[in-house]
């Protein structure tokens, strides 16, 4: 008996996409939200505050490099100093893209209390005050910067604000690395109860100023945990 074979399999018509049934612009595992929590003006104001803070920190660290007697601290401050200069440039480049707002007008402290806080951070100039210098930067200022940058990152639009998100992530990488360096330097310098008390007194004084300022971007820097309307 001879088997019979078809020369070609019978073709079936492929179903076509139904234009009357549109698909979502984003996949089910990536359903982004367009608006974000910041208006263009609010984002620009925050970025201007970031730039001002980074510039002031660059100046403070640069001034200390020449006077701190501890060589290991001197080298680390020099490295960190130029990171903050780069961050200031990074934020400056974001400002002109925001509705042609004037970058110089936006480059300012959030309020007078933030300006007073930064003056206090930079105030210790005597060579024997290295502990006070390190506490101000690595136990107060940088943790507050990390909080502000993280809040901004978590609350802005991944669609319309992707360049700012990229800048925030790069800055945060540096901030975490520098915070770790600074904290380890500080721990290595505290050898007595008196050193611990110096560090504690310095941190308390600066944290009090920051509370009065409301954060590096003023009140609302990291949102309001007591605002029940945002639940």
Where are these regions (language model features)?
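Extended, helix-rich structural scaffolds rather than catalytic motifs
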Residues: 194-231
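Conserved alpha-helical segments that form or flank metal/cofactor-binding pockets of metalloenzymes
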Residues: 75-118
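Acidic, low-complexity proline/glycine-rich segments
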Residues: 5, 11-30, 52, 103-115
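Amphipathic alpha-helical assembly/interaction segments
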Residues: 33, 92, 132-136, 143, ...
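Helix-loop segments that flank and shape redox-cofactor active sites
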Residues: 56-79, 147-164
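Acidic/His metal-coordination segments adjacent to aromatic residues that form catalytic metal sites
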Residues: 28-48, 106-141, 209, 213
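Amphipathic, well-ordered alpha-helical segments in soluble domains
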Residues: 25, 53-61, 87, 91, ...
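An amphipathic alpha-helical core segment
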Residues: 164-204
């Amino acid at each position: 008996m001879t088997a019979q074979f078809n020369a070609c399999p019978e073709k079936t018509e492929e179903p076509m996409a139904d234009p009357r049934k549109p698909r979502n612009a984003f996949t089910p595992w990536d359903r982004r939200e367009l608006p974000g929590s910041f208006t263009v003006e609010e984002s620009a104001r925050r970025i201007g505050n970031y730039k001002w803070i980074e510039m002031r920190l660059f100046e403070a660290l640069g001034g200390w490099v020449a006077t701190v007697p501890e060589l290991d601290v001197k080298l680390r401050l020099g490295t960190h100093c130029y990171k903050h200069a780069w961050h200031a440039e990074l934020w400056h480049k974001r400002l002109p893209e925001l509705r042609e707002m004037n970058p110089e007008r936006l480059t300012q402290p959030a309020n007078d209390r933030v300006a007073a806080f930064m003056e206090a951070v930079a105030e210790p100039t005597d060579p024997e005050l290295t502990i006070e210098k390190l506490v101000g930067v690595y136990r107060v200022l940088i943790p507050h910067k990390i909080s502000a940058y993280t809040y901004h990152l978590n609350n802005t639009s991944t669609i319309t604000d992707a360049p700012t998100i990229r800048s925030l992530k790069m800055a945060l990488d540096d901030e975490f690395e520098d915070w770790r360096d600074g904290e380890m330097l500080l721990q290595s310098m505290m050898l007595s109860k008196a050193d611990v008390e110096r560090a504690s007194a310095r941190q308390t004084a600066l944290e009090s100023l920051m509370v009065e300022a409301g954060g590096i971007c003023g009140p609302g820097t990291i949102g309001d945990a007591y605002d029940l309307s945002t639940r």
